[in-house]
């Protein structure tokens, strides 16, 4: 962070062409010279705020500062914040590429005051930066401002202190159907900090359509909002009354792209230097001329959102943030395809982006290769279904005309089978003036979700139906039992009851409990709750709000509300769960050391039997790396170092390098777990593992006993999973593997160290036999080729060979085609082979004929008819399908189909 004025602040004379990078630097320099602390942009994944999908405003990272929860060592801040608006409440995706100012990614310049200066200084700073010849030097006669209708204080500052004519100050009242609901009144929520705001507008001139703010023509493009200054001065109460805040604050925002467009004398954000360079790069990479196509703007915009999201730890997936990222990538790929891109191209846009923005955001430079790899992998995956999906969509649209609607069933099939996000389908149909039945799509989606829920039902989410206002005090960190706790609630079938009798299944809520509730990946604990009249077996513990929900069965007698009880956790299960939980922390640290800091936790499951850890990584982890990871964890266990738990302020924890799980909600005070030996990095002592965690752990690393990885697999694109055992479970696994190795050695009549070599020898022999079989198949194919050439027919003046061949698989088919081609010139060859219940499809078209018909189209036709898959190049293509009763009819109809294609 920068705390003092820059030694060489950027000077920006008004007649100079300004690069976007210059504007960003000038803004920061200006406010640092006004004693603001330069705070770096926060991640696009909102830290400590699961209510947000993405960071979408400069104030997101300061939310707790405005609420008075987060006390920092500065009261003035300036930022250039990365923002994404795609998915969720704030979604600009559909408009990107078609308007002058919509983006998925943008930068928000902002200055903030936390109980320091207020309206007078905020307005003065904004005006100075915008109009001073030392800074941006905008023509003051082109600026208008809006204020909240009753904000006389802001009016007086603009009119009397700044000298703005009264007719240039526009009052905007409540225009959203409720008191204090206005374009010029900002609120954090239904209750809490809020206040009036004042916006600065720039007049692009009479040649652009549009009216002043507050007029019926305000949606035009003539008057463009440049800067918004929010004055948080009230605290809205639940009854709607406004109480003055003891320390009013300021939150401002100015879009970097918008102000750059004004300074560079262009109307569209896509005409500023940054976008011009990206658009030109997109045209060069795709191999087309830049004719200002909307699709080029889409590609240039989307590479920013995609690259920064991946740099901040988001990877393509089918849910949450990962699915929004996937939608953006696939939209860009489709627009590139529309422009003529035939191969993967989008990942090549990362390099031009790094050139434009790498200086301001070094993380782009550091993670360039990782970003490119992640994008390319998603491109390749989507390419497998893009062409098929587009053909299906084209066939659905053939019978529709402008103004019609594509059925929800068709849109859902494109989504479910071909990976087309519904907004991508809408993007394509909109180009033809056709809408989408979104309600029908949602209905199909709900049906699928219900099927998934029905298939996965094995238990009742009993905590969801129980709402308890009174929080439970957890006392289990240092003890397994607690005497004389109070039963404050009994529930059966989700309803509160006064008594649970023997055999009843139900839920007990206590005022204090030693039972750990499911959280942080660790399962809830088991044990018993005993009163003078009965015993309740606790089978699981969860949370409902701040209350702990103990689910189980009355084993003996009965329990009543308001009774006192003794609560006891099963010791052996607690110890085993603690071992596995601590091992996940050591595993996480080892993964980052071996695979790199880009690895981040995506989920975990910790039970008494095993542990499961999901993490971001693009490839399968090699056996060598797995062995290293396993060794590192066991070295920490062997070191038998004491674990340390400390409560501290969350900012202090982050400063120490503590890892946090994105999406988790943490309070101001957090529990920090430090494990393992201390190492020296960059001259600083750092523990092997340091994480925020509220779970149960061992006292010393040696208590884990032993760590053994049992599997590593992929569960989604870019997400890997490791399963492992600890303690006696790990020992039993190793002993079982040892026994299996001994049995295998006996079967092979070899010594144990010789088993691998003996198996390799057998595998080599099998491969040689398979090669011999393949050579025999090729001989059979060659023999068939000699007879097949006699079956050539003439269709539309072209030589065509259509034939079925027996006992030929896909591997042998290529050799057979080559043999036939050596005997026939300028011929279309279509062969279908059948072997072991599978059909092998192949087509070859002489290069002289590919202008008339393409091999890929032939195979796609056959694959569609026979419910198979396939594709390829214009001169050669292959495919496959299951054996089918349809084959005879398809082959009989094939000459007529070929004729229709050649006519």
Swiss-Prot record:
Gene3D superfamilies: 2.40.30.130, 3.10.310.40, 3.30.54.20, 6.10.250.550, Bira Bifunctional Protein, Domain 2, Threonyl-trna Synthetase, Chain A, domain 2. The gene is alaS. It is found in: Cytoplasm. Binds 1 zinc ion per subunit. It catalyses: tRNA(Ala) + L-alanine + ATP = L-alanyl-tRNA(Ala) + AMP + diphosphate. Belongs to the class-II aminoacyl-tRNA synthetase family. The lineage of its organism: Bacteria, Pseudomonadati, Pseudomonadota, Gammaproteobacteria, Moraxellales. It holds the Pfam family DHHA1. It comes from Psychrobacter sp. (strain PRwf-1). InterPro entries: aa-tRNA-synth_II/BPL/LPL, Ala-tRNA-lgiase_IIc, Ala-tRNA-ligase_IIc_anticod-bd, Ala-tRNA-synth_IIc_core, Ala-tRNA-synth_IIc_N, Ala-tRNA_ligase, Ala_tRNA_ligase_euk/bac, DHHA1_dom. Catalyzes the attachment of alanine to tRNA(Ala) in a two-step reaction: alanine is first activated by ATP to form Ala-AMP and then transferred to the acceptor end of tRNA(Ala). Also edits incorrectly charged Ser-tRNA(Ala) and Gly-tRNA(Ala) via its editing domain. This is Alanine--tRNA ligase. HAMAP family: Ala_tRNA_synth_B. Transmembrane segments: none annotated. PROSITE patterns: AA_TRNA_LIGASE_II_ALA. Consists of three domains; the N-terminal catalytic domain, the editing domain and the C-terminal C-Ala domain. The editing domain removes incorrectly charged amino acids, while the C-Ala domain, along with tRNA(Ala), serves as a bridge to cooperatively bring together the editing and aminoacylation centers thus stimulating deacylation of misacylated tRNAs. Its cofactor is Zn(2+). Zn(2+) binds at residues 581, 585, 693, 697. GO terms for cellular component: cytosol. GO terms for biological process: alanyl-tRNA aminoacylation; negative regulation of DNA-templated transcription. Its EC number is 6.1.1.7. One of its GO terms (molecular function) is tRNA binding. Keywords: Aminoacyl-tRNA synthetase, ATP-binding, Cytoplasm, Ligase, Metal-binding, Nucleotide-binding, Protein biosynthesis, RNA-binding, tRNA-binding, Zinc.
